[in-house]
From Swiss-Prot:
This is Porphobilinogen deaminase. One of its GO terms (cellular component) is cytoplasm. CDD domains: PBP2_EcHMBS_like (cd13646). Its cofactor is dipyrromethane.
Length: 342
């Protein structure tokens, strides 16, 4: 490759994005960052409606999982309508199709789940029988394990729809990703940020990923200043847990890595949807590279396998049918992402 191409600022760039309010915010966030790097570059946003945005009457894990949020964007990359696609990282399948690359992972927003309620300040304050809304199997399993006296019901729709359902009294509380609420200036709706013990975040939650065609080395170089090494190591470790376990979107699976005292600490969970069986494993690595972070993810996945995680994965994948079984490792974040992009 001609390195001179990399040093020449791009003249135009097109960002492919879902058309949801949060997705467009994220695309605009990247557009502004690129404009600061390359003031003379004309950066446009191509808004697109994905199948995942259109299906609102079913849990997405039953009709195709995470891939429903990215296929149309990848088609735009492939045919040249767009140069890059901006994703909430937990929307991105663990294995990308041939010819595509996740070139850039940006600095993470708050990865925690958030309790949104008009009447209660914590999950512990909710009375027996209170209805909590979520379409995330991960969140549902954690709620059923920690608060079996609560009633968990599905919640779909975009962010405004979900909040309106809460406000009209359909739910006593709902659980959403904190990052999406904060990015849209709705942080005041958060009554509590959930401790990982109550709701371990999904792999990649709160992080933005930029996908490009694998043959665009020039574009990868232009995007390199937006890459955040610490976030990349954390989410690569998390995604490796999901990838190694090879579960389907029907499997409540979470992985969350944090940096403390120069070391990366990773925890993973696999559960049954009813919360009756929850397996947990954790490990740490000092100042890991991305390669060591991936190995850390494999270590945690292996520890979960030794506890019987694959029994849960196989049983749930078989019960959900071959379509879900083919989806590859994934927490059920795709269902949440229809609302918040997170």
């Amino acid at each position: 490759m001609n390195t001179e191409t990399f040093s020449t600022p791009p003249h135009t760039l097109v960002i492919a994005s879902r058309e949801s309010r949060l997705a467009m915010w994220q695309a605009e966030h990247v557009r502004c960052a690129l404009h600061k790097l390359y003031p003379s570059c004309d950066v446009k946003i191509l808004g697109m409606t994905t199948r995942g945005d259109q299906i609102l009457d079913r849990t997405l894990s039953k009709v195709g999982g995470k891939g429903l949020f990215v296929k149309e964007l990848e088609a735009a990359l492939a045919d040249g309508r767009a140069d890059l696609a901006v994703h909430s990282l937990k929307d991105v399948p663990m294995e990308l199709p041939a010819g595509f690359a996740l070139s850039t992972i940006m600095e993470r927003e708050d990865p925690r789940d958030a309790l949104v309620s008009n009447d209660y300040d914590s999950l512990a304050a909710l009375p027996a029988g209170a209805v909590v809304g979520t379409s995330s199997l991960r969140r549902e399993a954690m709620l059923r394990m920690r608060y079996p006296h609560l009633e968990v019901r599905p919640l779909r729709g975009n962010l405004d729809t979900r909040l309106s359902k809460l406000d009209r009294g359909d739910y006593a509380a709902i659980i959403l990703a904190a990052a999406g609420l904060k990015r849209l200036g709705l942080g005041e709706r958060i009554r509590a940020l959930l401790d990982p013990e109550d709701s371990l975040p999904a792999a990649g939650q709160g992080a933005l990923g930029i996908e490009i065609r694998a043959d665009r080395a020039d574009l990868a170089a232009w995007l390199a200043p937006l890459h955040h090494d610490h976030t990349a190591a954390a989410v690569e470790a998390e995604r490796m847990v999901s990838r190694a376990l090879g579960g389907s979107c029907e499997v409540p699976l979470a992985a969350y890595a944090t940096w403390r005292d120069g070391a990366l600490h990773l925890r993973g969970i696999v559960a049954t949807p009813d919360g009756q069986r929850v397996l947990s494993a954790q490990a740490s690595a000092p100042a890991p590279s991305v390669e060591r972070a991936v190995a850390l993810g494999q270590e945690v996945a292996s520890a979960l396998e030794q506890q019987g995680a694959m029994d849960i994965v196989r049983a749930l994948s078989a019960a959900s049918g071959p379509a879900a079984a083919k989806q590859g490792a994934a927490e059920d974040g795709a269902a949440d992402s229809a609302a918040t992009g997170e």
